[in-house]
């Protein structure tokens, strides 16, 4: 079930991020915790939960029209959770809005799964970036 994230989800989201932090260039727990709390307060975070297990989470910015984080539990990957979370966020925008996301650069194998997922949802490469000394790619 996908729903808006609540303040009491923060610890589960932190635990999930610890499992997948290597998938996020420049991840820092303190900065993530602060950003997560702000997104929850603004209604800009969703979680996918099955019984007591947090399967995935997504955060976004209405102002920037961007997905800012998307994480799926390693045991729940390839089940369509990321796609459902992306489409849930897309439903928060107007159809003509262009939503962006940043992931690892095209030549970085750490971003292969994420890029495939984003592309299956209609995202296309727009520009190459560097974040925290890591080559990345912006998709829209």
Q: Which role fits each region the language model picked out?
A:
Residues 4-69, 73-75, 86-87, 92:
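Acetyl-CoA-dependent GNAT
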Residues 29, 130-131:
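Proline- and acidic/polar-enriched loop/turn elements at helix boundaries
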Residues 70-81, 104-107:
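A short, internal acetyl-CoA/4′-phosphopantetheine-binding micro-motif in the GNAT/acyltransferase core
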Residues 83, 106-128:
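Conserved active-site alpha-helix within GNAT-family acetyltransferase domains
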Residues 93-107:
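Conserved GNAT acetyl-CoA-binding A-motif
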Residues 132-136:
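Short acidic/glycine-enriched loop/turn segments that link adjacent beta-strands
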Residues 139-140:
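Core SAM-dependent methyltransferase catalytic element
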